[in-house]
Amino acid sequence: MPASAPPRRPRPPPPSLSLLLVLLGLGGRRLRAEPGDGAQTWARFSRPPAPEAAGLFQGTFPDGFLWAVGSAAYQTEGGWQQHGKGASIWDTFTHHPLAPPGDSRNASLPLGAPSPLQPATGDVASDSYNNVFRDTEALRELGVTHYRFSISWARVLPNGSAGVPNREGLRYYRRLLERLRELGVQPVVTLYHWDLPQRLQDAYGGWANRALADHFRDYAELCFRHFGGQVKYWITIDNPYVVAWHGYATGRLAPGIRGSPRLGYLVAHNLLLAHAKVWHLYNTSFRPTQGGQVSIALSSHWINPRRMTDHSIKECQKSLDFVLGWFAKPVFIDGDYPESMKNNLSSILPDFTESEKKFIKGTADFFALCFGPTLSFQLLDPHMKFRQLESPNLRQLLSWIDLEFNHPQIFIVENGWFVSGTTKRDDAKYMYYLKKFIMETLKAIKLDGVDVIGYTAWSLMDGFEWHRGYSIRRGLFYVDFLSQDKMLLPKSSALFYQKLIEKNGFPPLPENQPLEGTFPCDFAWGVVDNYIQVDTTLSQFTDLNVYLWDVHHSKRLIKVDGVVTKKRKSYCVDFAAIQPQIALLQEMHVTHFRFSLDWALILPLGNQSQVNHTILQYYRCMASELVRVNITPVVALWQPMAPNQGLPRLLARQGAWENPYTALAFAEYARLCFQELGHHVKLWITMNEPYTRNMTYSAGHNLLKAHALAWHVYNEKFRHAQNGKISIALQADWIEPACPFSQKDKEVAERVLEFDIGWLAEPIFGSGDYPWVMRDWLNQRNNFLLPYFTEDEKKLIQGTFDFLALSHYTTILVDSEKEDPIKYNDYLEVQEMTDITWLNSPSQVAVVPWGLRKVLNWLKFKYGDLPMYIISNGIDDGLHAEDDQLRVYYMQNYINEALKAHILDGINLCGYFAYSFNDRTAPRFGLYRYAADQFEPKASMKHYRKIIDSNGFPGPETLERFCPEEFTVCTECSFFHTRKSLLAFIAFLFFASIISLSLIFYYSKKGRRSYK
């Protein structure tokens, strides 16, 4: 026999002192909550959470937590005329030739759905009526503890009223319950899930007639008598809001009556009385022997205020009152409707008598909650939002219910999402919504102290989706509706849910734990400024003319004609903008500083016919001043930027990188930079982050040749004298399969990586040619635009690197299923998406630290054990945010993943560069805030400095490493460094000469005085 319903668990206390302080600051949580207390919820969640609390929450659910999956009779059973079943209102509604307003049952029908020439119906649906073993095997595969299903009223009582029941119908449900007992899965049984027998609709007008409550009681008694010994959780009515409002007011759902709002409220009134009758029946006649629990399944949306004002919060409270409170307050509080409804709907809202209030009050043994797209985002009337904003936030709804209805035990009896009807087994969107909702449930339990006892994923299998027909899918198991056997094939969401149940939540994983340790002594700690502040205004007076001041008359300076002073030599200290930047870098304690040159400023015409020597001098001074304070400059020759992609205007007009001549011009420009700056610069980047996603194949072809030419210029003409290193910096965001269980998604991810990174990396770091994945994919689609390299060009390009430099910012999920046309790439046949549980920046860039480690390992696997630099890594924050905790969290975790890659994976990692230096040149990305012509360090700068000073993340067991202080070589000082002994001897002679001369001078004066 199934175990009895678990006893009520002690209410878990809120776990943290900070949460208690929040509650006390809001007036405290009373021992007994009252209607209206839920309004505190918006204030509690008004401030954004700390980054570590906003993202992935690690933890497990309480012991004995109920893991369930659900289905509804009309959606899945089929067999609409089999074995004496009577017609239901949904049979009639779907067979009706005229669909009500807003109906989309035949929209975008998937392959395998009923013909669009016929109305979509549940006549066959998933055919569960003939497949008990198939369905229960799916339950066994999932590993759930509970299965929620509904009984078809018309299948057990074809006429709807008490009388001779349909034995075949009873046998079907007994067989299902027996099979559940064999598997150790407990049933959660819904008596009414929208499918009223048509006979009762015809005879009484459906739920608009109060007499239907007695028929419902009789039907429930039949079910309790036949099945109650095996059922410990009963749901009387599913989603009475939808039944009343959309069945009898809007007519969007069966029975399709387009009545007045008054009729909708009358139906809801009768539904509440019917529910109460059934609860009292069970409580009096069956609970003593069967020991089960009974409730009503209530659906709700969640709503956020447009502004955090008292008025907006009251409107949000009213919105929930009009949907959830409409039914929850009578059942859980006092037997009557919310005050906001009575005040606004006094003329059309029915009244309960005092005896009816007592009869309805307390008729639920737990709070059965439904939360998902059917109500929250599809069937919620706009006027019930009260001009506020919907949000799929389950955690906040759970907290509101906890406060509003006196801390009930909550059983989430329906929750999930949907995917397109054309989506088959890789239902990534559904899977990530499932993950989000379950994680929010865990947060509600662990962080907010809400007593949630169980969770039900909806639904077990694809089926008929009410007003959406077969245009969407909500099942964990895929059903081909055209097949004869109607096999259930597990989707990615099913595999995810099975793993989650097995782990009982999200236990901390070893790979997600921070690593203690330090980087090598010579590790490069840098910061990036792609658009360096170039200000060539000299700090000294540079006018060579001579002026007289007309003191007596005009009070102005008067130029003296024909008189000029001698031109003074310029010095680096003349550039006023350099020293403040150097001082900030010193304050940060970085060892390296990366900046980009502006090709268009240095060579306005694109060639050396016109060279801006002032700009070159500025860059030379910047580099030399960095070296002087022991900061190594890392210089990029070209950075794609507006305007003209960072190219001289003439080259941009001549086709930019589409023109092969640009590659030759770049090589000459590089030669000039090496010649002018190379004595100070020992790390060069030819091109920084050429963005492949908006670049043509011919442009990429020429860009690769330009890089190779520049590399060879340095290698052959300057390396021996300057002893520097040079490479290209590629953007390398990680691409992760959206469905980790899908081989197709893994193939898609690899394809995108090759197009995003391999396109430029493979010719340089690999074979000298483009990736075969890229070439093969394009050839299959008759796209022959990807150029070919000659053998000489391959030799020219291959191996043109001294290190591998990558810029990494985020991770992107890719899926093979087309779910969102806006984000679908038809060219690569890939759907880009994100895990909605991930932490995001204000610009919606996902924070996924482990992606950095993965891309480093992918690059090592592809191109070998090369020295690597993370040449740029950063995130945006709120405008003018001084306490940028998101960036602190980002840097802490990304750098720690870099440490894991170095220590655990053996990646030859040589340096890390944070992006970006300041907000002036990169607004919202800087480690320094810029306001009122002042630079102010943000919290992230101080945190980064701490990491630099510690050389990583040393722990108590980290071996202390002695790192001798190193100094960057000063080129101008090389003469002195190589002649230290000679210079010391000369200094000694000079010092001795000074002493001797001083003594001679002293005694000569003394001698003269003695003769006077």
Curated annotation (Swiss-Prot):
Belongs to the glycosyl hydrolase 1 family. Klotho subfamily. Residues 34-981 are extracellular. Its EC number is 3.2.1.31. Residues 1-33 form the signal peptide. Glycans are attached at residues 106, 159, 283, 344, 607, 612, 694. Keywords: Cell membrane, Disease variant, Glycoprotein, Glycosidase, Hormone, Hydrolase, Membrane, Repeat, Secreted, Signal, Transmembrane, Transmembrane helix, Vitamin D. GO terms for cellular component: apical plasma membrane; extracellular exosome; extracellular region; extracellular space; membrane; plasma membrane. Changing residue 352 to V: In allele KL-VS. It catalyses: a beta-D-glucuronoside + H2O = D-glucuronate + an alcohol. It is an enzyme of class 3 (hydrolase). The keyword Cell membrane applies. Coiled coil: none annotated. This is Klotho. The gene is KL. GO terms for molecular function: beta-glucosidase activity; beta-glucuronidase activity; fibroblast growth factor binding; fibroblast growth factor receptor binding; hormone activity; vitamin D binding. It comes from Homo sapiens. The lineage of its organism: Eukaryota, Metazoa, Chordata, Craniata, Vertebrata. SUPFAM superfamilies: (Trans)glycosidases. May have weak glycosidase activity towards glucuronylated steroids. However, it lacks essential active site Glu residues at positions 239 and 872, suggesting it may be inactive as a glycosidase in vivo. May be involved in the regulation of calcium and phosphorus homeostasis by inhibiting the synthesis of active vitamin D. Essential factor for the specific interaction between FGF23 and FGFR1.
